[in-house]
UniProtKB/Swiss-Prot annotation:
<dbReference type="GO" id="GO:0005829">
    <property type="term" value="C:cytosol"/>
</dbReference>
<dbReference type="GO" id="GO:0008855">
    <property type="term" value="F:exodeoxyribonuclease VII activity"/>
</dbReference>
<dbReference type="GO" id="GO:0009318">
    <property type="term" value="C:exodeoxyribonuclease VII complex"/>
</dbReference>
<dbReference type="GO" id="GO:0006308">
    <property type="term" value="P:DNA catabolic process"/>
</dbReference>
<keyword id="KW-0540">Nuclease</keyword>
<comment type="similarity">
    <text>Belongs to the XseB family.</text>
</comment>
<dbReference type="InterPro" id="IPR037004">
    <property type="entry name" value="Exonuc_VII_ssu_sf"/>
</dbReference>
<comment type="function">
    <text>Bidirectionally degrades single-stranded DNA into large acid-insoluble oligonucleotides, which are then degraded further into small acid-soluble oligonucleotides.</text>
</comment>
<dbReference type="Pfam" id="PF02609">
    <property type="entry name" value="Exonuc_VII_S"/>
</dbReference>
<keyword id="KW-0378">Hydrolase</keyword>
<protein>
    <recommendedName>
        <fullName>Exodeoxyribonuclease 7 small subunit</fullName>
        <ecNumber>3.1.11.6</ecNumber>
    </recommendedName>
</protein>
<keyword id="KW-0963">Cytoplasm</keyword>
<keyword id="KW-0269">Exonuclease</keyword>
<dbReference type="InterPro" id="IPR003761">
    <property type="entry name" value="Exonuc_VII_S"/>
</dbReference>
<comment type="subunit">
    <text>Heterooligomer composed of large and small subunits.</text>
</comment>
Length: 80
């Protein structure tokens, strides 16, 4: 099975995979190379999740602005 790029995954799917990786790493039964690969994947998932959270926070901030006379601005997600 091909592994999806973290930036192409939903936030929920990334968190679910990250949770599974943490469980595997905490178990301590992995060879060093396997543990490093899973750690790298986990870092990628965490960064992608943080980026999605930052984008959502920006969207919420735009929607909750109190200035009724302000023009709507385009949402520009952070480049990955």
């Amino acid at each position: 099975m091909a592994t999806k790029k973290p930036e192409n995954m939903s936030f929920e799917a990334a968190i679910e995979e990250l949770d599974g990786l943490v469980d595997q790493l905490e178990n301590g039964d992995l060879a060093l190379d396997d543990a490093l690969k899973k750690f790298e994947r986990g870092i990628s998932l965490a960064r992608a999740g943080q980026s999605k959270l930052n984008d959502a926070e920006q969207r919420v901030s735009i929607l909750l602005k109190n200035d009724e006379n302000a023009e709507l601005s385009d949402f520009n997600p952070q480049p990955e």
